[in-house]
UniProtKB/Swiss-Prot annotation:
The keyword tRNA processing applies. It comes from Saccharomyces cerevisiae (strain ATCC 204508 / S288c) (Baker's yeast). Component of nuclear RNase P and RNase MRP complexes. RNase P consists of an RNA moiety and at least 9 protein subunits including POP1, POP3, POP4, POP5, POP6, POP7, POP8, RPP1 and RPR2. RNase MRP complex consists of an RNA moiety and at least 10 protein subunits including POP1, POP3, POP4, POP5, POP6, POP7, POP8, RMP1, RPP1 and SNM1, many of which are shared with the RNase P complex. The lineage of its organism: Eukaryota, Fungi, Dikarya, Ascomycota, Saccharomycotina. One of its GO terms (cellular component) is ribonuclease MRP complex. GO terms for biological process: intronic box C/D snoRNA processing; maturation of 5.8S rRNA; nuclear-transcribed mRNA catabolic process, RNase MRP-dependent; rRNA processing; tRNA 5'-leader removal; tRNA processing. This is RNases MRP/P 32.9 kDa subunit.
Length: 279
């Protein structure tokens, strides 16, 4: 600072000090003022961000513990829900089979041969059994309104079959969901199963669980996939009876529908299924 400027001495030191010359005599007052360049506060901002984002070992351990606890809770919930669904399905099937046997016994004891008469009798005399009976009519919308629309959209089926790709359709059918499909057993090692037709209520790993329309009472049957050929039709339009017919080799479908959706089927030897041709 220039000494010729008398503002500091006349205006400041004379009011604050008895001797205005004292700071100059003691060399407490410098002639120049040193100024350093600044970065506009960038360094301080970076330092604050580093302090906020700094993670010590304790914080990392807490985060990992919270993540592991969330994963374990999610896994336990999934296992519990999956277990409960399996238990509920098993109980439903066993309960339906037990009540079906009771109905057949009542029909034999009362010499009832008509289906409507039997249902009317059970509804009046045994309402608890009637409420838990599986009825084929209740599952028909599952086939007509859900599965048919689903499979048509999956295969891109239209009234004009000239643009239909058959090889691509086979690939999609191998990964399709058959819950709600109307299947018919055409060949089987168990001869008593041949000719059975029903709507699939659950596509399990080794069985097609179907509701079958009976002469006296509707039943739920577990049809094994092993050694069985299933057949189904996809109607092209509602105007006529034209449909696409396909067959399922149960031995190649022994996978859950969830696993089959992401599985790529490869060509393999078929000598283990010669009985299909021989029979």
């Amino acid at each position: 600072m220039d000494r010729t400027q008398t503002f500091i001495k006349d205006c400041l030191f004379t009011k604050c000090l008895e001797d205005p010359e004292k700071p100059f005599n003691e060399n407490r007052f410098q002639d120049t003022l040193l100024l350093l360049p600044t970065d506009g506060g960038l360094t301080s901002r970076l330092q604050r961000q580093q302090r906020k984002s700094k993670l010590n070992l304790d914080n990392l351990q807490k985060v990992s513990q919270l993540e592991s606890a969330d994963k374990q809770l999610e896994k336990r919930d999934y296992q519990r829900i999956n277990k409960n669904s399996k238990i509920a399905l098993r109980e439903y099937i066993n309960n339906c089979k037990k009540n079906t046997k009771k109905c057949l016994k009542l029909a034999y004891e009362n010499k009832i041969t008509d289906k409507e008469d039997l249902l009317h009798y059970i509804e009046e005399k045994h309402p608890t059994i009637y409420e838990s009976l599986p009825q084929y009519v209740d599952f028909v919308p599952m086939y007509k309104e859900l599965w048919i629309n689903y499979i048509k959209e999956l295969l891109n089926i239209t009234k004009n079959l000239k643009t239909f790709n058959g090889s691509l359709a086979l690939l999609k059918l191998s990964m399709a969901d058959y819950n709600g499909a109307l299947l018919r057993v055409t060949k089987s090692k168990n001869k008593t199963l041949i000719g059975l037709q029903g709507i699939v209520i659950w596509d399990s790993q080794k069985f097609f669980i179907m509701i079958v329309k009976g002469n006296i009472i509707d039943e739920i049957k577990c049809i094994p996939k092993k050694g069985t050929v299933f057949q189904f039709e996809i109607p092209i339009s509602d105007d006529d009876d034209s449909a696409l017919r396909y067959s399922i080799l149960g031995d190649r479908f022994k996978y859950r529908s969830v696993d089959r959706a992401g599985r790529k089927f490869k060509s393999r030897r078929c000598d283990d299924m010669l009985y299909y041709i021989q029979n």
